[in-house]
Amino acid sequence: MALRYVVHDEISGFDQLKPEEYEVPQKLNPGEVLVKLKAASLNYRDLIITKGLYPLPLQLPVVPGSDGAGIIEKVGEDVEGFEKGDSVVCNFFTNYLDGTPTDFATHSALGGTRDGCFQKYAVLPAHALVHAPKNLSFEEIATLPCAAVTAWNGLFGSKEHQVKPGNNVLVLGTGGVSTFALQFALAAGANVTVTSSSDEKLEFAKKLGATHTINYKKTPQWASPALKMTNGVGYHHVIEVGGEKTLPQSIACLAKDGMISMIGFVASEGTTPNLTSIIGQILNRNANIRGIFVGSVSMFRDMVACIEAKDIHPVVDKVFPFDQLKEAYEYQWSQAHIGKVVLKID
């Protein structure tokens, strides 16, 4: 017997997060492996699923947890490239291997339409696995599937608009995706501006290498000073995690032919922007706006190569023991974290 967490409904919130016993799977189908999970990390998505706020496909009851890493315990038939004892991490979409995502691919999300990683053992398809970076701990590896791959896709997923040395990159916030975007953009030789409502978090961003920072609480109309920081050129890439409240300003400081990667909607809702004005700004800047829905196994492998080559280490804010998942959810919900919140499983 082993322990796992299960989300049973969308109304009980974090109170339903209690360890439950289950039988460790022994039979594997061809192409499957049994992974003994060592660590997992939290995402905003995991939190809102328990509160009925998740707008995408969901099949309850489900073991939550979008991110996880561990060691292969058992290998099924017809598995190539992996063997018992390998350290691995699973892609968020288990059926998104490469290219343009399909409905089939995006309906294979860990912790949503199939059981996730807040459990001791998980059966996973081998085609969704990636060999873990050799330079990272399991707590660090577990932060990669959602936040890191999303940031990587936002910066490098469009062949026509990959970030280049000397580009200006605007990163909103200092959560998981934003922190990875800062690190990857710097590794590519870009100039990076970071926004946050916390001077403490902005100081941390500077320590990571941020070129400029803006406190949007002190400067609510931050687009103009952000633009000045680029000498009027604007930003070639914007990592946009705010949504309705921040998008108009992101567009206002975009460079000509710049790319906005739409990733989230974590900012409090603002007044609905004047759509005609927004369209005018998009046209004026020849703007590119691209929705980012995590990424593929192929992107994950490319990202791991970069992490190893540049010795990039994820920012882990706090690690909780396995029996304190509810406390971990509450901590992340408070938005006190910088980078990632991790659950140590074993």
Curated annotation (Swiss-Prot):
<keyword id="KW-0560">Oxidoreductase</keyword>
<dbReference type="InterPro" id="IPR013154">
    <property type="entry name" value="ADH-like_N"/>
</dbReference>
<protein>
    <recommendedName>
        <fullName>Zinc-type alcohol dehydrogenase-like protein C1773.06c</fullName>
        <ecNumber>1.-.-.-</ecNumber>
    </recommendedName>
</protein>
<comment type="similarity">
    <text>Belongs to the zinc-containing alcohol dehydrogenase family. Quinone oxidoreductase subfamily.</text>
</comment>
<dbReference type="Pfam" id="PF00107">
    <property type="entry name" value="ADH_zinc_N"/>
</dbReference>
<dbReference type="GO" id="GO:0005829">
    <property type="term" value="C:cytosol"/>
</dbReference>
<dbReference type="Pfam" id="PF08240">
    <property type="entry name" value="ADH_N"/>
</dbReference>
<dbReference type="InterPro" id="IPR052711">
    <property type="entry name" value="Zinc_ADH-like"/>
</dbReference>
<dbReference type="InterPro" id="IPR036291">
    <property type="entry name" value="NAD(P)-bd_dom_sf"/>
</dbReference>
<dbReference type="InterPro" id="IPR011032">
    <property type="entry name" value="GroES-like_sf"/>
</dbReference>
<dbReference type="InterPro" id="IPR020843">
    <property type="entry name" value="PKS_ER"/>
</dbReference>
<keyword id="KW-0963">Cytoplasm</keyword>
<dbReference type="InterPro" id="IPR013149">
    <property type="entry name" value="ADH-like_C"/>
</dbReference>
<dbReference type="GO" id="GO:0016491">
    <property type="term" value="F:oxidoreductase activity"/>
</dbReference>
